[in-house]
């Protein structure tokens, strides 16, 4: 009976321990107040918005990192940090994690994405087999034999010295010969024992290598994919395509997952900045003597792309932790004399990546194992089996579609559940020639509009009833629209396409015109009295547009005739 109680108690402890690994991302986290979102509300007195491009560029061996200036009123209000990464063909964005959650949109290209989640198992295995290097085995064998021989010679010299001190030369000679024969047998026995042990060690290492490499999930990414990441989760990206891989990433510095301050910090596990430490130290001293704004901007750059966290550990500690590696490997772990930056040119990197249909098949099998309900059991299935990407560039999956005006694709926690853990979402909008979106506002989120194609005109109106932005936008620009600000966009002659990244997992927009608009939900009499118009005009105002959010441009009869010819 006591044995059963002990086993039951041990099982409970194991379950609690496993749950603790994944607790920061459990759904219950939503009940926690968004401390950071409330902390910076006093900074949201926005009088003027600007459509901006990256203000700083950081070059690496195989790519470029471009950073927006987040020390503007709208960026401070939203708590956003925006970064664009360009990875050249064959380039590898080194593994890193952040103190804040973020969401990435792949603008162009294709590649491979890796995700490492604490507490999740290594469920992927490469097909290629590794051969333990023969030269390394020989080197270890020669080194061990040399050490063994040295110890044997030292024992021989010590014994001979003791024998000579006894006085009788014949006895010494006889005993020395006897000792020599015994010591020879001892050395031979020790050598054979060492050889067998070394052989077993090499055999064990060889068997370990022959089983192949095991790792956590990797998946293929392409243009239109949205990739989220919680704080502290390691991700890396490899461009195995023929063109540049371009992505835009939005960090939520005000998230409750950020326990530090209002700044975003990236922690790299490899690599090093192209600048030397002395250069960075010199620049830091120069900034301290300069303006506060310049100092803040440069500090933000360094926090995002400064150093490898292993650089700060001493060699002795790393050698104790990572056994069976030489000093050269330890030096490379720390990034000593590595000036390639954080996007490096990969060599002989061949990954077995499951295709999308294989991922779906594996996910369906997991659902069937859970009884087909799709619900998690509260342990690793709560997080480890979640999707880490969703494509928003598929017309067949559009949430709003107007064949003559455009479409809207939304990714939120309903179709990508991991977004519920990080409180972020995205929306991809395509407007055809001269089409219009809005006016509308975000009920519960700030949004960052990043233009991916074309150009158009945008108007934004703030809480004081006056325009805070009225200008054209073009590809590569970001416009931050605070919560509640009404925005309308009209595409140019080449159309307009953009992605909106928002800091709520289920961001809701409220249109002012159209079939699902707020005006459509208000009685005609209320509209008539509100605007001091007749009920007939109020009815026209309410029902003038039958489309949903995406509108055809108004055209006069003459304009229609000109288009026909």
Curated annotation (Swiss-Prot):
A GO MF term: nutrient reservoir activity
Region of interest: Disordered: 126-224, 271-301, 356-376
TM spans (from-to): none
Entry keyword set: Disulfide bond, Seed storage protein, Signal, Storage protein
Residues of the Cupin type-1 domain: 49-331, 390-539
Tissue expression remark: Expressed only in immature seeds.
Subunit structure, interactors included: Hexamer; each subunit is composed of an acidic and a basic chain derived from a single precursor and linked by a disulfide bond.
Protein name: 13S globulin seed storage protein 1
Classification lineage: Eukaryota, Viridiplantae, Streptophyta, Embryophyta, Tracheophyta
Gene that this sequence comes from: FA02
């Amino acid at each position: 009976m006591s044995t059963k109680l002990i086993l039951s108690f041990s099982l409970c402890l194991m379950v609690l321990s496993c749950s603790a690994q994944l607790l920061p991302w459990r759904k219950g986290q939503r009940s926690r107040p968004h401390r950071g979102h409330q902390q910076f509300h006093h900074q949201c007195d926005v009088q003027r918005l600007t459509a901006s491009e990256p203000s700083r560029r950081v070059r690496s061996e195989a790519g470029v990192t471009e950073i927006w200036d987040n020390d503007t009123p709208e960026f401070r209000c939203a708590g956003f940090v925006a970064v664009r990464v360009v990875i050249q063909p064959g380039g590898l964005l080194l593994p890193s994690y952040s103190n804040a959650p973020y969401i990435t949109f792949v603008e162009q290209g294709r590649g491979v994405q890796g995700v490492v989640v604490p507490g999740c198992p290594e469920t992927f295995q490469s097909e290629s087999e590794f051969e333990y290097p023969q030269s390394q085995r020989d080197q270890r064998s020669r080194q061990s034999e040399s050490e063994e021989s040295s110890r044997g010679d030292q024992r021989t010299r010590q014994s001979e010295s003791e024998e000579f001190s006894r006085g009788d030369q014949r006895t010494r000679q006889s005993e020395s010969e006897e000792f020599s024969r015994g010591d020879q047998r001892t050395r031979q026995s020790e050598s054979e024992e060492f050889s067998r042990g070394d052989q077993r060690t090499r055999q064990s290492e060889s068997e370990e290598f022959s089983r192949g490499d095991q790792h956590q999930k990797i998946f293929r990414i392409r243009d239109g994919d949205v990739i989220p990441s919680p704080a502290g989760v390691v991700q890396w990206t490899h461009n195995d395509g023929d063109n540049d891989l371009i992505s835009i990433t939005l960090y939520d510095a005000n998230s409750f997952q950020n326990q530090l301050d209002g700044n975003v910090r990236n922690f790299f596990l490899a690599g090093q900045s192209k600048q030397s430490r002395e250069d960075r130290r010199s620049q830091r001293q120069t900034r301290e003597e300069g303006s506060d704004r310049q100092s803040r901007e440069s500090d933000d750059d360094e926090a995002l792309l400064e150093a490898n966290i292993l650089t700060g550990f001493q060699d002795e500690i790393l050698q104790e932790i990572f056994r069976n590696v030489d000093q050269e490997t330890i030096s490379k772990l720390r990034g000593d004399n590595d000036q390639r930056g954080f996007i490096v040119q990969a060599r002989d990197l061949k990954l077995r990546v499951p295709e999308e249909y294989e991922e779906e098949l594996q996910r369906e099998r997991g659902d069937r194992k859970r009884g087909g309900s799709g619900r998690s059991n509260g342990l690793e299935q709560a997080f480890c089996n979640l999707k880490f990407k969703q494509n928003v560039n598929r017309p067949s999956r559009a949430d709003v579609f107007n064949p003559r005006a455009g479409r809207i694709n939304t990714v939120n926690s309903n179709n990508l559940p991991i977004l519920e853990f990080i409180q972020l979402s995205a929306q991809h909008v395509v407007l055809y020639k001269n089409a219009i979106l809005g006016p509308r506002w975000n009920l519960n989120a700030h949004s960052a509009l990043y233009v991916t194609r074309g150009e158009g005109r945008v108007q934004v109106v703030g809480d004081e009833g006056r325009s805070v932005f009225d200008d054209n936008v073009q590809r590569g620009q970001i416009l931050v629209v605070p919560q509640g600000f009404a925005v309308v966009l009209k595409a140019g002659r080449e159309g307009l396409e953009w992605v909106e990244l928002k800091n709520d997992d289920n961001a809701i927009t409220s249109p002012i015109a159209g079939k699902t608009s707020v005006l459509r939900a208000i009685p005609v009499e209320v509209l008539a009295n509100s605007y001091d118009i007749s009920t007939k005009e109020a009815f026209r105002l309410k029902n003038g547009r039958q489309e949903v959010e995406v509108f055809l441009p108004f055209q006069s009869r003459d304009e229609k005739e000109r288009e026909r010819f």
